Structures are given as structure tokens and as C-alpha cells.
Amino acid sequence: MTQVAKKILVTCALPYANGSIHLGHMLEHIQADVWVRYQRMRGHEVNFICADDAHGTPIMLKAQQLGITPEQMIGEMSQEHQTDFAGFNISYDNYHSTHSEENRQLSELIYSRLKENGFIKNRTISQLYDPEKGMFLPDRFVKGTCPKCKSPDQYGDNCEVCGATYSPTELIEPKSVVSGATPVMRDSEHFFFDLPSFSEMLQAWTRSGALQEQVANKMQEWFESGLQQWDISRDAPYFGFEIPNAPGKYFYVWLDAPIGYMGSFKNLCDKRGDSVSFDEYWKKDSTAELYHFIGKDIVYFHSLFWPAMLEGSNFRKPTNLFVHGYVTVNGAKMSKSRGTFIKASTWLNHFDADSLRYYYTAKLSSRIDDIDLNLEDFVQRVNADIVNKVVNLASRNAGFINKRFDGVLASELADPQLYRTFTDAAEVIGEAWESREFGKAVREIMALADLANRYVDEQAPWVVAKQEGRDADLQAICSMGINLFRVLMTYLKPVLPKLTERAEAFLNTELTWDGIQQPLLDHKVNPFKALYNRIDMKQVEALVEASKEEVKAAAAPVTGPLADDPIQETITFDDFAKVDLRVALIENAEFVEGSDKLLRLTLDLGGEKRNVFSGIRSAYPDPQALIGRHTIMVANLAPRKMRFGISEGMVMAAGPGGKDIFLLSPDAGAKPGHQVK
């Protein structure tokens, strides 16, 4: 089916320029790159861009700590980020920075248009001020309890638990992240974007098909609670763009960050000497398509503020937001101490990029589900699918073609009907790539790979090769196998760019989506070289070890005043000091399927979440009753792999056992994360 070529602009969320790229980041960039590569294969004009998010107080303070300028720090970080993305073969057409002249000009233009149209309001506000550091505190440098859901240890601009946004002054019991001091109130004039004026437009846009259903439903909750005016200014000292005609006032980082999409594209157009495309893509009535791939943690900014800013400044809105979930490793949050907080560069020191690209792709769908990188499953799947099913299909046929037929394939297909089965799958697989149902696409491709290998098994070319007078049959069978390999690799081309390059070199032809309609007949292939190597758990172990920032000593045995048990043998104070007891909030409690003794507890230690299995089910038949309670846990107990998952600590309880188990709780006033001394 012939497709009409489309003009498409694709972006990924801008990585913040104060830290390295890790495997959590890579999920989004791989997802977008696979989609972009598919679009290019179908003949569409795609511009794929990104940039570093380079402004804000965190950058300013970190540069001060390093003894360098913010400009120097973000320059070095940009080079590191670009190296990592190139290592994973992310095919960006341009990678820029929000700290650029293009972004400054566009930020000022959008601000001026919003102001001219009456959407910028000035008012004096009472703002939190750090008396020890002598500075107003940006949202992310104040932490406290969320005023909406009462979750502790939340930042001053939005809650990571319930997703609500609010002013830092609304936080309960705020603290300065910079000094730990309790902030004081000081007056300051600020500029506000009148978001409520766009409520009707945003509600219509929400239901226009521009958002996934899960996102649209979440936005409806925000509409029902009412939209608030958005503070878009920050006081000096601040690293960013100064607001025109407002000395000492700077654009809030979340105003100029999404404008960075426009700035990066403008930079690309200027590099090309193209004075037309920027307006063609960004004008109000543009027919080009604009897609933002983002994580679920920044939906609020991209689904409310960003389209409203564009609407109010006479630019086009996004065609769609493609939102994904988080990455866990081995069923738990990425952990530096366990070696599962893995940087992109560390991964590339131990594995190739295609392996992770394939694993993520096989697990992705159009939904906002979290993706678990199970390292053992990763090894098994890469070996089973890429090596055993796909690459093996080429290797088991290429030898005969090279040795017996000088690399020349047969002049006709041995099984045209089977080949047509493979090419007919292009529509289903293509639709899966298009709709971001990547896991479905991979399943369809691997089902074809099974079919291809079954054909080779049944035809047994290694047997035919030994039979006199069957050279033509041998050539036909192996040529069929190689043609099926070609179709499979064409379908996988968006996912496996490096393997594709090697396959194209062997096949002596470029792999194109439409090209598979014509099989390779009477065609000379090149001598076969190993296309892909098996991986093993030793590489995983080396990766994890390299990722560990520190190895924690095993926790000492815990003693306690259990009523019916004698006091244990005396220990030294130093022994006891090894045990790190912390106050924890029970965020969730549930039964463990397959166990009549355990409850699964989700604990909040004041910024870090832990998954703990506890044998207290007999005493707490209704686990929901535990939710919201504070308890005491051993926070530095080495994680323990259990049949049901990994337990990341131990909660403290007293009693002889059975129904007589009593979970310990701290006195009123203790907060999650407080150390028990």
C-alpha cells in the first residue's frame, strides 16, 4: 500500500544537564528512535531532535560546588550526553541546548506575545527565603509534605505521588534543601501565566485524541480540581534567561525548557540554510505532525502549560504526546548500592547497544506501563531471539551458499507461498510499529522466525548436501532460508541498527520496507561473517559490579526484647551501631500470592521507596489497616532474593508469633527517614 509522505517532527524530553544518562533515560530515547526509524523506512520526512535542559538553580549550585562556571559544566555534560546517545545509535538530526541564542530569542518572543495578549499577570507574592544562604528558594530546593495528599518529602512545585502542582509556600513543614534551614517568608514581585484562561481549549484538546486515554483521564482530575495561574519567574541568583525589562528576574526553567524543542529545530534549520521549515512546522495552521515522547512524571507540564503557551503565542500545538512509564531493574527501583543504577556509558562497556534496544522494544506498548529490566531474562531473551532464531537462520544456510555455489542464490524461490506469508505480515507488523505496540511487533516477527527455522529443520540442508545430484535442491533450500532472514531483518531494522548494517553487508543489498516484495534471486551474497555473539551472565555480573558505588557490609544480627525468648549473647556497641534503624511510612500493604505467611509492604523512608516482605500475615488479616502507619525498619539489611521478589529490608515487630505479632511504631512526630538512635 502506497503511503502519502508526511512531514514529522519528533522530540524526546530534554535530559537535565547536571547528571549522566542512565538506563531509565534510555527507554524513552530508544522508544522514540525505533518509531522514527520506522517512519523513515516508510518514506516520511522526519526531523528527530533533542537538547540538554541547561537552566535552573541546581545547575548553578552544582557548578559552584565543582568550582567551574555553569557554561563550562553544561558544555561538558552536553558532550557526555551526545556520546552516550550516539553509542546507543539514537539517530538525532540535531542535539542542542536550552542555553542557546535560538532559545533565548524564542523564549522572549513567546513571553512577549503572551504579555501582549493579556496572559501574563504581575503580582507580589510571599516567597520562601533561605536566611542562611541569603537566597530565594526555587521550587525544587524546598521540600515538605504535599498539601493535597499529605505525602512527605515532596518538592515545592509538584508532588511525585499524586501529581498535584502547588506553590512552595503551600508545603507543610518546608525545609531548605540547600542548607536544611527552615525558610522564612519574604515578598517579591513575580510574573504569572494565566493558565485558567485556556481551560476550555485544553479540555477540548485533551479529548481530541492527542493524548493516551490514561493521560486524558488524569487530566480530567486536574480540570475538576481547577487550574491555577503558573508562576513563570524566579529571582536572582539564577542560571537562565533574564526576563526582558525586569532586572533580577529570570524565566523559570519549565518555561524555556519545552521551548528548547523549538530552539533545537531552529538551530537545525539554520545549519541547513533552511529559512522555510521552521515556520512550516510551527505555524498555527501547520499540517506537519509534532510528537513529544515523554515520561509520565512530566505529563502535567506537557499536557497543560506547554499547549497553553503555544496557543497563547499563536503557535501550533502538539499532534500527540507519547507517554511511557519508568524502568525498574530486577523488579525493584534502580539502586546504586546494588549496582542496578546503570549509566549508559557503563552499559556500553559490557554490552552492545542493540541488545538493550531489543529488550526494551520487546516489552514496550502504547500504554504507560513501567518496564522491568530483568537481567537474567535479558540474557535469555537476547540469546534465544536474536542469536538462536534470527542470526542462526542466516548462519546455517550461508555456509552452503558460499562454499558450494560461490555465494550465488537460486534463480527461483523454493516455497513462494511461505515467502508470501512473510511479506503479507508487513501490514500487521507495520501497524504495530506505527501504533507503538512494539511488543506485538516483536512477537509477530519472532513467530515468523520460528516458522523459518522450522522450514530449514524440515528441509535439512545438511542432509541434502551429502546426497549426490541434489545441488539444485540444496541451493534452493538455503536461498529460501536466506531470503526469509532478509525479511526478518527488514522488519527488525528500526530496532537493531548495528546488526542491520552487518546483515546488509552479508546480503549485499540495502534492506528497505518495500524491497522485500521482490526476493533476492540469482543474487550474489558476500562471505558470511559472525553477525552477533551470545551473551552470558558473567557479563551481567561484571556490569553490576562496575555500577556499584559502594558495597555495604552485611547488617549485624538484630536483637530485641522478645517476651518469651531469653536475652541473646552480649554484643558490643560497635556491633549495634552497624544496624541502621529508620522510621518508615507504610504506603501500601497487600497479600503475597502463593504465601500464607507474608505481606508485601511498600515503605517510604522519606525520599526512597523500599519493597519488604514480612511474615506478619497471621497477625494482620486485613493488610489495608496498615496503610498510613509509621513503623521501624532495618534499612541497611542486604537485599534478599525471595521466590516472590526482592525484599529490601526488615520491619521490626515484637511478640511470640502467630496472631501475637505486634508491629513497632514510633512516637507521634517521628518522620519517615528519621534514624532510630
From Swiss-Prot:
Q: Which residues form the tRNA-binding domain?
A: 575-677
Protein's cellular compartments: Cytoplasm
Q: Name one GO cellular component term.
A: cytosol
UniProt cross-references to CDD domains, sorted A to Z: Anticodon_Ia_Met, MetRS_core, tRNA_bind_EcMetRS_like
Short motif ('KMSKS' region): ranges: 333-337
Q: Which cofactor does it need?
A: Zn(2+)
Look up the record and give one Gene Ontology term from the biological process aspect. Answer: methionyl-tRNA aminoacylation
Cofactor comment in the record?
Binds 1 zinc ion per subunit.
Q: Which NCBIfam families match?
A: metG, metG_C_term, PRK00133.1
Q: What function does the entry list?
A: Is required not only for elongation of protein synthesis but also for the initiation of all mRNA translation through initiator tRNA(fMet) aminoacylation.
Name the UniProt record assigns to this protein: Methionine--tRNA ligase
Q: Which organism is it from?
A: Shigella boydii serotype 18 (strain CDC 3083-94 / BS512)
